[in-house]
Amino acid sequence: MAASPVAEVWASSNAKARGRALTAAWLGWIAFPLLFLGISFSQSAPQTVTIPCGNLHLKALLWKPGGIGPFPAVLFNHGSGSDAEHTAGMTMTEAAGKLAPVFLRHGYAFLYLFRRGQGLSADQGSYIGDVLRHEEAVKGAEASQHLQLVLLRTDYLDEVMSGLAFLKTTSGIDARRIAVIGHSFGGQLALLVAQRDPKVRATVAFDGAAHHSWQRSAEVREELLNAVGNAAAPIMLVQASNDYSTAPSRDLAAELERLHKPHVLRIYPPVGRTPDDGHDAVYLATTVWEEDVFQFLDKYVKPN
C-alpha cells in the first residue's frame, strides 16, 4: 500500500534528520582536533561573556575570526550613548553587531564591553547620562564636568582595565597583540588605558571628547594631553569634519607631534547631515575609515 502524504513527509524529515545528525557527528570529529590545534571557525553570532570588576558583573560580546589562533584582538569601548540602551540610533547590541564583522574580516577578535548602566550591563549601575544630569541639577555644570572627569579616571577606567585583563586571558587570544579602541567617552577611556598599560600595542580614539567635553573642561583637556604624552602605544585619532568639534583630535595630534611620538590623524569629509551623524561616524561610515584604521592596526598590532 502506498504511503500517505503525511507518512512520506515524516519519512523524508526523519531521513533528513538522520543525515543532519551524521553530518554533525562528522563535523564534530573534524572540529575537535582543529580546536585542539588552535583553529577556530568564524563566529556569525557572538559569545556573551561576563567580566568581573569589583562587585560588578559586566557583560560583553566576544567574536573570534576563523582560522588558526591565537588571534590579535581589539577591545572596543562605546560612548555614553543617547540613552542607556542606544547609540547612533541603534540598540547597543545592534551597534556592536555592526562593527564586529569589519574587525573579523581583517583577522581580529573583537570584544565589545558594556560598561555599567548601559546595554547588556544596564542592571549593574546607573547610566552615566543620568548621573551627570543629576549632578548638574543639584550642583551646577562645573560640578558635573568635574564628576565626569573623576568617573573617567576611576570607575569607568577600572571597568575597561577589567575588560582588558579578561581579554588577555581568553583562550585563542594573543595577549601580546591587543589594541584598545573607543568612541566619544570611550575614546577618552582608550587614551587613558594606553597610559595605564604599556603593553597595549595600539590605540584608536574615534571622536574622543568631541561632544563638548574638550571646550568646556580644562581638566579634561589636561588629562588627555597628559595621557597621550605618557602613552607607550602609537595612537590614531579619527573624526569626521562635521563632528561637534575636531579640536580634540587636532590638539592631541599636535602634542604627539611635539613629542615626536608615533601617531596618525584622520579628519574625514562630513558624514551625514548633522553633528550627531559626524560624531557617530564609527558606526555610520565604516567604509570611510576601514582602510586607514586597519593599515594602522596591521602595522602595529598584527606582527608577532
Predicted regions and their residues:
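N-terminal cap/lid segment of alpha/beta-hydrolase-fold proteins
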Residues: 41-68
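Primarily recognizes the serine-hydrolase "nucleophile elbow" in alpha/beta-hydrolase
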Residues: 152-224
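The feature captures the conserved acid-bearing segment of alpha/beta-hydrolase catalytic domains
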Residues: 202, 208-264
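Alpha/beta-hydrolase
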Residues: 77, 113-115, 206, 268
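Short substrate-entry loop that stabilizes the transition state in hydrolases
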Residues: 69-71, 80-122, 212-213, 245-246
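Alpha/beta-hydrolase active-site loop
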Residues: 128-170
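C-terminal catalytic histidine-bearing segment of alpha/beta-hydrolase fold enzymes
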Residues: 262-304
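The conserved beta1-alpha1 loop
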Residues: 77-79, 239-240
